């Protein structure tokens, strides 16, 4: 359990410390303001990630938390709900800051491009916002994998002691790369569903967000996100923990060299779980923003 905690904490520390430097983004032609925005995002992500790990991993049921059965009926007990609630509260706060930093930027109309979301009927402003998020995620993923795979940079990025107990070999590095690559593809796929939906008003239910004053349309969008995230989470955890299903979902060659043990599975599962919850709050904040009046051209969004 403690090693699983170490893995999650390591990810949080890397999120907080590895990327904020302007020079890390030099090749991306980013201005100072954008670099500061990404730096603030990663710093906040590190803080709330640590808090979430602390709340969830202190419980006695960690070993079963990420098993396939944990996602079956979402039968979370009161203690788990309290931990998730605290996490979502933190996620909401840093989500607001992230939206402010990224959505107010002057650039990145080409980061994804309107044509990438043509079928979703998104206007240019929405595409820029989504593009910024995906672009940042892509850069973060590349840099994170780079830090792990290049031992010469470890001392500057995190410190050699952070990796001492883990002793990651090439096999483990490939596993981290696969996870980040899958997460990026998943994010791109479900963005369209969130932003251009006509259904799922019952997926979460208006009452779940009553205090946030979400209208029906916002609830539908959030419902789609949660539905997609739940399916993704089930499949990902199931594939990692059950080697018998690998051949159908990805192909045995994808995981053949990984040979993940139980400790690694718990760490990956916890990271995925926190990412899912952060995404839930982040999308909620984007869709409940005062700036959305222009983005979706709907008077119901105007105060």
UniProtKB/Swiss-Prot annotation:
The record's GO CC annotations read: extraorganismal space
Q: Which residues form the signal peptide?
A: 1-18
Can you say where in the cell this protein is located?
Secreted
Name the Gene Ontology biological process terms: antimicrobial peptide biosynthetic process; defense response to bacterium; defense response to fungus; innate immune response; killing of cells of another organism; regulation of defense response to virus
Main location per UniProt?
secreted
Propeptide segments, given as residue ranges: 19-26, 33-36, 62-72, 79-82, 108-118, 125-128, 154-164, 171-174, 200-210, 217-220, 246-256, 263-266, 292-303
Record's keyword terms, sorted: Amphibian defense peptide, Antibiotic, Antimicrobial, Antiviral protein, Cleavage on pair of basic residues, Cytolysis, Fungicide, Hemolysis, Immunity, Innate immunity, Repeat, Secreted, Signal
**Record's keyword annotation contains Signal:** yes
Q: In which tissues is it expressed?
A: Synthesized in the stomach and stored in a novel granular multinucleated cell in the gastric mucosa. It is stored as active, processed peptides in large granules within the granular gland secretions of the skin.
Q: Does the keyword Ribosomal protein apply?
A: no
> What is this protein for, i.e. what is its function?
Antimicrobial peptides that inhibit the growth of numerous species of bacteria and fungi and induce osmotic lysis of protozoa. Rapidly inactivates channel catfish herpesvirus (ED(50)=48 uM) over a wide temperature range. Magainins are membrane lytic agents.
Give the protein family.
Belongs to the gastrin/cholecystokinin family. Magainin subfamily.
From the Swiss-Prot or TrEMBL record, give the protein name: Magainins
Instruction: Provide the species name.
Output: Xenopus laevis
């Amino acid at each position: 359990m403690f090693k699983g905690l170490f893995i999650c904490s390591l990810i949080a520390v890397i999120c907080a410390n590895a990327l904020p430097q302007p020079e890390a983004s030099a090749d991306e032609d980013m201005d100072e303001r954008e670099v500061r925005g990404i730096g603030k995002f990663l710093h906040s992500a590190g803080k709330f990630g640590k808090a979430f790990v602390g709340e969830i991993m202190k419980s006695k049921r960690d070993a079963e938390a990420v098993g396939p059965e944990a996602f079956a009926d979402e039968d979370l007990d009161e203690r788990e709900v309290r931990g998730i609630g605290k996490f979502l509260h933190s996620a909401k706060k840093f989500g607001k800051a992230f939206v402010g930093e990224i959505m107010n930027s002057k650039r990145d109309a080409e980061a994804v491009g309107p044509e990438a979301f043509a079928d979703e009927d998104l206007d240019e402003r929405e595409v820029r916002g989504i593009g910024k998020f995906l672009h940042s995620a892509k850069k973060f993923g590349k840099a994170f994998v780079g830090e792990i795979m290049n031992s010469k940079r470890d001392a500057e990025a995190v410190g050699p002691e952070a990796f001492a107990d883990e002793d990651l070999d090439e096999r483990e590095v490939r596993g981290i790369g696969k996870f980040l690559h899958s997460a990026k593809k998943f994010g791109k796929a479900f963005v369209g569903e969130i932003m251009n939906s006509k259904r799922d008003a019952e997926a979460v239910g208006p009452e779940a967000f009553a205090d946030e004053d979400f209208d029906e349309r916002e609830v539908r969008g959030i419902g789609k996100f949660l539905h997609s995230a739940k399916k993704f989470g089930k499949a990902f955890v199931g594939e990692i923990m059950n080697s018998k299903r690998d051949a159908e979902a990805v192909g045995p060659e994808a995981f053949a060299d990984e040979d993940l043990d139980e400790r690694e599975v718990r760490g990956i599962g916890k990271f995925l779980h926190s990412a899912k919850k952060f995404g839930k709050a982040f999308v909620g904040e984007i869709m409940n923003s005062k700036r959305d009046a222009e983005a979706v051209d709907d008077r119901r969004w105007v105060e």
